[in-house]
Amino acid sequence: MTTTQTAKASRRARIERRTRESDIVIELDLDGTGQVAVDTGVPFYDHMLTALGSHASFDLTVRATGDVEIEAHHTIEDTAIALGTALGQALGDKRGIRRFGDAFIPMDETLAHAAVDLSGRPYCVHTGEPDHLQHTTIAGSSVPYHTVINRHVFESLAANARIALHVRVLYGRDPHHITEAQYKAVARALRQAVEPDPRVSGVPSTKGAL
């Protein structure tokens, strides 16, 4: 596996991640306006990442190819790893940001919540999904999305961005709604956490570093 990283500016990142299973390029601008272009070869995942970038107000470009003819797992997880790496790089030294964010997102019968701390200490808690999501496939294309991957996505994002991320489903029935509400909750929590805080000029930590 090879990974190359190039910082364009303090709030931007470009990540290239290549393995025998996938080839991924991500461009991220935290100070964007929600301009998103995603092509992973997994249509439902494209839909989820588009929602994430749009509702976080990030400018996000994702180009990924992988062994989806075997199964989408590798491409989905590797893309989440690269996205987390890009987020961590774009945050830089985290001076002047709010650091914490949280959001409740309803989607019809579903309610999801996400809370984030851009702490530099990677941790993910993912809870509340109904048991049937362990065995649900969202099809509609030749490359389906298995909802059991949701936890892997959030864990990979948190680990590689080095953030604490808590995602929970309070209630819901429809697998599409449950999945999408979680992605949107994470997006809105991140949007809040990365925002500049006009009252903070340094790193938002009593330790002086994150």
Curated annotation (Swiss-Prot):
Pathway the protein takes part in: Amino-acid biosynthesis; L-histidine biosynthesis; L-histidine from 5-phospho-alpha-D-ribose 1-diphosphate: step 6/9
Gene Ontology BP term (one): L-histidine biosynthetic process
Subcellular location: Cytoplasm
Highest rank taxon of the organism: Bacteria
Signal peptide coordinates: none
Entry cofactors: Mn(2+)
Binding-site residues, Mn(2+) 1: H47, H74, H176, E180
Stated family: Belongs to the imidazoleglycerol-phosphate dehydratase family.
Protein name: Imidazoleglycerol-phosphate dehydratase
Organism: Mycobacterium tuberculosis (strain ATCC 25618 / H37Rv)
Lineage: Bacteria, Bacillati, Actinomycetota, Actinomycetes, Mycobacteriales
